[in-house]
Amino acid sequence: MKDEIASKIYVNLSRCEKGHDSCTEYSSMLHDMVHGHMLYDTVDFVLNQKDVPEIDLLAEVSPYLMNRSDCIGNDGLPYVRGKYKGYNVYVNTHILKINACSLCKYYYGTNMHDFPLEDVRKAIEGIGEDLNIPMDKVTVTRMDSAMDLELQRSPIEYFNRMLDLPYFRRLSYPTGITFQTAEKELLFYDKGKEQGSNNKNIARCEFRIKKVRKCFGKSVTASMLYDPSFWNDLLDRFLSCYSKVKVSKESLPLDKINGIKILKDCALCDYVNRNGFDPLRSGFKARVRDGELAQRACK
């Protein structure tokens, strides 16, 4: 599987045109991924009572839960909340929800581990056996895939150069960045700091599909997760999304800035590098046209 991932990445890189953003020095993150392990991380499951009329989900699943709370809803119907090996579980007379936990962590005790499809199958079948539910009828409502990349430099240096992903909203926070839509999210953060490994430059890349049915155009069942063709489709979607991230070729040389003039010059160079010279020139011409600048400013 690792070789398969590697081949897909090299094919993706070979299609880059000269000068394309993803072919800058920061394509090294793509090359580093050859040495990482793409895996399923957080996966949320749902099973509807109508799909398993032969099973009383509330009665069947409730006894297996830890930290169990038996409640009555506003509709007067009973429901139960509890924990199952790291997962949050909610079950009532209509639906069973199993969510908010890494499938990899459920199986290995950590989400930093190679997770071959055979083990994905064992993990999913294990959930079904423990809770006595048919996993082939369980649907996936959220699906995160992830990869850890060991880098030569601080992950933040890479993240700061990731400028834009078309049709996604970019948000940044102290340890990483995320590109979001209502359906999907591409997230990068410093996994080394999260793990307390300050001496290691480990970046975590996560591809989150928050609306699985809408994204794939069909229901995705738990048993599909370990199907190689489905996994390859997911990899293609991830690589397609990742390859569209626009990155800058250079960052501001903060260690060499010792005055306001140099700062302004560097900021101007950085703007041109990120956006090209044409938008800057067009902006100057517009200001000349509007009388805000003299004609000589554009010469």
Name every feature range the model reports, one short phrase each.
Residues M1-S282, A286, D290:
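Structured, helix-rich domain cores that form ligand/interaction pockets
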